[in-house]
């Protein structure tokens, strides 16, 4: 959605390189940085054009350089370009719920126009320091490994780190299913440079679970903003800001607690690096844009909780080649309250969700926040798994029989703990055939205490695999014996 200035300011295209377009304006009439420009009309081949570009640089000699928000196919030099006099603006408020938008805030779900008057520009300052809310509180997700080892902060930022195909999107879909249905507030999902198929699956999943009510959109609890893999880098670079702007309105004006899901934050960085060289910037480490820290900071600092309302954000972060030291994930780490790291090794063992219990962290896991019982159980689980990890080399070389009695017991319990950290998901029912489970935090803590205390030493480890709470594991063991 692009607003037009009263006095039309018209320029013409002088150069097109991929998604980057140079435009010449009359002297003294240059648009401002981040202004939206529109290119409409017909080219020489008779193609209808309707394109929005965003000003990135003022080059001198009355020329500006802009990045296109959709494909530049069919553009030719000399075409007219109109300055709208304002940044890209997107619709906000209740009318956005249950709808799918593109980066410009145009609905793309074939359900007609959005009937609301209010729009906001996607470029806005972050809240002031004095407006921030700092009281820590934890919210329950119903996923055992998350609630026990990396509790999520209400109004915090959580990263889901993982390489290709280890289950980031599935965990995110499960979190949307669990939290959006339990949480009662509103959610915004920004699909940044991910697969179109997953976007479609997610939409259908939400209609089934009732998060989107197709018959009465006002009762829906989520707004979706998509800029998929096949879109030009301009769209992928800005779609996160479009989603965030919708979330900010719910927080600041409606004074609501909002959930913001971003899948995938790496694609936002990747899109920035794709256009960076075309904008004439020198690449920095590993070919990323030199403005990497600023780009990520401008997005992340707006995702925060104020005294008016909160934004709790869950962001998937693709890790290139499983290397957590890559500049993109490393820069994102600095902004997060909790990190849920997914492990390819666990995924290969078939343990889903493949959350690494030793590599994942949370600033919330402190006795004065979660309580002593939760804290001590979580640390005991981690130390048992750490000891098992240390013993694995000895087991590989000498075998289990060479371990002391005590170490053998630790290994047996660690293997049970590892399996009990797996869980059937509601959103994966179609693939696994097992009904999904939501496990309350107290049941999670009780279950791990029983395993570590030795109460369940005589049960086979297979009984703990892909179950909900500990009673299900005991029932499964009975079945296996029977």
UniProtKB/Swiss-Prot annotation:
This protein's name: ATP synthase subunit beta
Catalytic activity: ATP + H2O + 4 H(+)(in) = ADP + phosphate + 5 H(+)(out)
Short name of any one Pfam family annotated for the protein: ATP-synt_ab_N
NCBIfam families: atpD
Membrane topology: Peripheral membrane protein
Domain of life where this protein originates: Bacteria
GO molecular function: ATP binding; ATP hydrolysis activity; proton-transporting ATP synthase activity, rotational mechanism
Family of the protein in this entry: Belongs to the ATPase alpha/beta chains family.
SUPFAM superfamilies, sorted: C-terminal domain of alpha and beta subunits of F1 ATP synthase, N-terminal domain of alpha and beta subunits of F1 ATP synthase, P-loop containing nucleoside triphosphate hydrolases
Alphabetical list of CDD domains matching this protein: ATP-synt_F1_beta_C, ATP-synt_F1_beta_N, F1-ATPase_beta_CD
Record function comment: Produces ATP from ADP in the presence of a proton gradient across the membrane. The catalytic sites are hosted primarily by the beta subunits.
Keyword line: ATP synthesis, ATP-binding, CF(1), Hydrogen ion transport, Ion transport, Membrane, Nucleotide-binding, Thylakoid, Translocase, Transport
UniProt-annotated location(s): Cellular thylakoid membrane
Subunit: F-type ATPases have 2 components, CF(1) - the catalytic core - and CF(0) - the membrane proton channel. CF(1) has five subunits: alpha(3), beta(3), gamma(1), delta(1), epsilon(1). CF(0) has four main subunits: a(1), b(1), b'(1) and c(9-12).
């Amino acid at each position: 959605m692009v607003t037009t200035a009263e006095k039309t300011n018209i320029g013409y295209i002088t150069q097109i390189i991929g998604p980057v377009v140079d435009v010449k304006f009359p002297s003294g009439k240059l648009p401002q940085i981040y202004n939206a420009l529109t290119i409409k009309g017909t080219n020489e081949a008779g193609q209808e054009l309707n394109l929005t570009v965003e000003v990135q640089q003022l080059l001198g000699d009355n020329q500006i350089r802009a990045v296109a928000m959709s494909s530049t196919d069919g553009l030719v030099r000399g075409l007219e370009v109109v300055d709208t006099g304002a940044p890209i603006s997107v619709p906000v408020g209740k009318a956005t719920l249950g709808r799918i938008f593109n980066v410009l805030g145009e609905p793309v779900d074939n359900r007609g126009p959005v009937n609301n008057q209010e729009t906001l520009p996607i470029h806005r300052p972050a809240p002031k320091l004095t407006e921030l809310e700092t009281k820590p509180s934890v919210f329950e997700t119903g996923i055992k490994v998350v609630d026990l080892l990396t509790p999520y902060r209400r109004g915090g930022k959580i990263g889901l780190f993982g390489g290709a195909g280890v289950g980031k999107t599935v965990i995110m879909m499960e979190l949307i299913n669990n939290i959006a249905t339990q949480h009662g507030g509103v959610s915004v999902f920004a699909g940044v440079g991910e697969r179109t198929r997953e976007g479609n699956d997610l939409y259908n999943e939400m209609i089934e679970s009732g998060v989107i009510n197709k018959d009465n959109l006002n009762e829906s609890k989520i707004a979706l903003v998509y800029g998929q893999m096949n879109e030009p880098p301009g769209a992928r670079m800005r779609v996160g800001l479009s989603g965030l702007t919708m979330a900010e309105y719910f927080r600041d004006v409606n004074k609501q607690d909002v959930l913001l899901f971003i899948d995938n934050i790496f694609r936002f960085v990747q899109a920035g690096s794709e256009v960076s060289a075309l904008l004439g910037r020198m690449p920095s480490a590993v070919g990323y844009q030199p403005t990497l820290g600023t780009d990520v900071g401008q997005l992340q600092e707006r995702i925060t909780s104020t005294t008016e309302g909160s934004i709790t954000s869950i962001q998937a972060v693709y890790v290139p080649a499983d290397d957590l030291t890559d500049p993109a994930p490393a820069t994102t780490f600095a902004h997060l309250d909790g990190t849920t790291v997914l492990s390819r090794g666990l995924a290969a063992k078939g343990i889903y969700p493949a959350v690494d219990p030793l590599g994942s962290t949370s600033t919330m896991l402190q006795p004065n926040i979660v309580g002593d019982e939760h804290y001590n159980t979580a640390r005991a689980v981690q130390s048992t798994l750490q000891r098992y990890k240390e013993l694995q080399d000895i087991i590989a070389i000498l075998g289990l029989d060479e371990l002391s009695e005590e170490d053998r017991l630790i290994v047996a319990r660690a293997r049970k703990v590892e399996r009990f950290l797996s869980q059937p998901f509601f959103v994966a029912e179609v693939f696994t055939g097992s009904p999904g489970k939501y496990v309350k935090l107290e049941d999670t803590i009780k279950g791990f205490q029983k395993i570590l205390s030795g109460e369940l030493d005589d049960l086979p480890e297979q009984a703990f695999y892909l179950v909900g709470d500990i009673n299900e594991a005991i029932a499964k063991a009975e079945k296996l014996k029977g």
